[in-house]
Every structure is written in C-alpha cells, then in structure tokens.
Swiss-Prot record:
InterPro entries with a match to the protein in the record: Ribosomal_uL15, Ribosomal_uL15/eL18, Ribosomal_uL15/eL18_sf, Ribosomal_uL15_bac-type, Ribosomal_uL15_CS
Residue numbers spanned by region Disordered: 1-57
Lineage, opening ranks: Bacteria, Bacillati, Cyanobacteriota, Cyanophyceae, Synechococcales
Subunit description: Part of the 50S ribosomal subunit.
Domain of life of the organism encoding this protein: Bacteria
Record's compositionally biased regions (Gly residues): 25-37
HAMAP family found in the cross-reference section: Ribosomal_uL15
Keywords in alphabetical order: Ribonucleoprotein, Ribosomal protein, RNA-binding, rRNA-binding
GO BP annotation list: translation
Biased composition, class Basic residues, residue ranges: 14-23
GO cellular component: cytosolic large ribosomal subunit
Native organism: Prochlorococcus marinus (strain AS9601)
Similarity annotation: Belongs to the universal ribosomal protein uL15 family.
Name of the protein in its database record: Large ribosomal subunit protein uL15
Length: 152
C-alpha cells in the first residue's frame, strides 16, 4: 500500500496523552494529584522559589559579597589614544618618560599601550609595551615607527 498525505498516521506510542490530574481516582492522578497528603509541596502556589531553604538563611545570602575581587593575571595598561600624540613635534620619540613630562600620564605604574582612536598628523617614533593594530597602522601611515618595549 502506498502512503499519501491523507493516510499518514503517527507511530503508536509517539504521542502521549496529557495527564488530567484531579479528575477521579480511576485516572490514577485523582484526589491529591500525585502531590502526597500534606505539606508545603502539596499546597497551591507551589513550587518555592529557587534557593529557598525553608526559612533558614539561604546560602546565597549567608556567603559574603566579594567586592573588589582581583582578577588573577589581569593585565593593566596606561593607555593613550593617538589623538593625544599630536602634541609632540615631528621626529620626536614618544615613551613613558616623555608622556609624563607632557602631563599625559601622571603615574607610570603600568606598561604603556597605544590605542588607535583619532588621527595622527605628526611623524613620531613611538616606544610602547603594546599597540592596537589600528594604532600601529595609523602611526606607520603617518611616516612614524612603532617599537615594542619588553617589560620584565
């Protein structure tokens, strides 16, 4: 027999009927509907919220909030955008010391990273610990050079 669209049927047992609870004991889920006799879990409005421990102070409230938790191996940088480097003259060398003298960096606590925001109009020799791809491209397009410093 060939099957056509009007004769298609689903396999037996593949479509289960919905359990109708509370519709008599013959259905198997009558009276207490499978929730047992008494107690909080048999009442209406159930279930309790996630993390509820029966009135005891829950774990997520017992444990202190860890504020100012330091990320392990996090790399911090002193960052400078390219537009700030326009304060220098042509063929100047830009490094942490020259940036401190100009007042662009206050405390040379972290390694220097050059970001590519803005345009650069001067030819500079930039010495930094890290460059973004865009920053390196823009410095070299302006006729300058980028030199990576090793920080140990």
């Amino acid at each position: 027999m060939t099957s056509t669209l009007n004769t298609l049927k689903s396999n037996s047992g593949s479509r289960k009927k919905k359990l109708r609870k509370g519709r008599g004991i013959a259905a198997g889920q009558g009276a207490s509907c499978g929730f047992g006799m008494r107690g909080q879990k048999s009442r209406s409005g159930r279930p309790t919220r996630p993390g509820f421990e029966g009135g005891q102070m829950p774990l997520y409230r017992r444990v202190p909030k860890l504020k100012h938790f330091e990320i392990i191996n996090q790399k911090n940088f002193s960052i400078i955008n390219l537009e700030k480097l326009n304060d220098f003259k042509d063929n100047d060398t830009v490094n942490i010391d020259s940036l401190v003298k100009k007042g662009l960096i206050f405390k040379p606590k972290f390694p220097l990273k050059i970001l590519g925001n803005g345009k650069i109009n001067v030819k500079l020799k930039v010495q930094a610990h890290s460059f973004t791809k865009v920053a390196k491209q823009k410095i070299e397009d302006a006729g300058g050079s980028c030199e990576l410093i090793n920080n140990k």
